[in-house]
Amino acid sequence: MKTKKLLAILFMCVTLAVTAQDFQEERGSLSFLKDQKVVNVEFKYDNLRLMKDNVTEKEYVDERREFLNNRNKGEGDNWLKKWEGAREAFWEPKFLDLMRRTVTESKGIAFQKDAPQAPYTLIVDAQWIYPGWDAYVMKQKAKVTTVLSFVETNNKENVLYQIRSIEAPGDQIGHNYSNELRIGEGFEKTAKSFGKLIVKRLKK
């Protein structure tokens, strides 16, 4: 009984310690979006750091692959394939889906990858990711930090609007033992909050 109570307390502490998403460093105006029908979307991972130690993606991948392969032969190699496919399979689709469910359904502005004909491009620059973990009795959410910039498609040096999304939490009801899926939930939360902010700004 004491063990169960202790685990429950530890779970509550971990849950309460999770930092909520925040937006910072907002600059520019979103007024240019009011008459738009399509916005191009690009995802960048050039500046990505991971974990509390801010390691590079290569450092993170090499260390985790080695750890998993040492635990079970081939496990790290299988994980690497999932990691490499996670961007296009989970992270980016979840972000785009929530932009559709917030901005597109409210304002009629579609957000699409590979839409070079669109006058404006949203650049989603993933800067920091914490994968989180799930140990059944306790878990910690993933966290995703991004810089979201609207630029002219034909002149990307011209930044019209930019904001920093800090530690968007990634989790879902129940248990999720996949780091990649938890991170995807963080991208989804980023888009959900950012989409609501866009709708709010365009009402002014």
Spans of model-derived segments:
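A structural "domain/chain start" motif
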Residues: 20-93, 196-204
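A structural motif
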Residues: 64-71, 155-164
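Short, solvent-exposed, polar/charged sequence segments at loop or secondary-structure edges
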Residues: 85-127
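Solvent-exposed, acidic/flexible segments
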Residues: 84-92, 141, 176, 180-187
